[in-house]
Every structure is written in C-alpha cells, then in structure tokens.
Amino acid sequence: MFVGACMLTIHLPVSASLKDKRQVVRSMKDRLRASFNVSVAELDPSNIWNQATIGVVAISHSRDYLDGLMKNVERAALRIANNLGAEVTDSFVEFL
C-alpha cells in the first residue's frame, strides 16, 4: 500500500484579514475534496493572514495511480488558487 502526500504553500495577496484567509482556504479544501477522493487539511493554523499551507493525502495500492492523482491535484490547486485570487508558491509531493 502506498501513501501520496502533497504540500501546497499558498500566497494570498488579496487577503486583508484572517476571515479572508479562512474563506479562501476553506473553498480550496472543499473543491479539492469534491474533485478528487483525497483528504485535505490546513497544516499551519497560524495567524499570518496572507500565507497558508495545505496538505493533501491519498492512499492506494498503485503508486502509478497516486503519481497521476497528485499531478492532477497540483494542477487543480493552481487553477483553483488562481480563480480565488491566490497563488501557489510551492508544492512538494512525497510517496511513502
């Protein structure tokens, strides 16, 4: 069994408060969950209102499937962030 994990660092230039940050992060998490069968969580519940880190995890018997899934998640995250006025500044994928 394989585990695929993706960490996304997001810059939120349009966010002027923690409320704005939570709104963007929640929307991004919900859309990724709805589009892919993955677990999504905010990894740094800090009070920095213009930056967030989101973790995405999936489990499968096929590493090739997870590789494709994580690539699709990264592409979707870039698109979703762009639509929300945010920017993915870094992404890291790891397989365990």
State where each predicted segment sits.
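Short, charge-patterned binding micro-sites
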Residues: 41-62, 94-96
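Solvent-exposed alpha-helical segments within well-ordered globular domains of core cellular machineries
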Residues: 26, 30, 34, 71, ...
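Amphipathic alpha-helical assembly/interaction segments
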Residues: 11, 27, 31-44, 66
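A generic structural motif
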Residues: 12-17, 60-64
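C-terminal structural segments of small proteins and small subunits
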Residues: 59-96
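Active-site-flanking beta-strand signature of metal-NTP-handling nucleotidyl enzymes
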Residues: 4-10, 55-56
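Absolute protein N-terminus
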Residues: 1-2, 96
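C-terminal binding/interaction regions
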Residues: 21
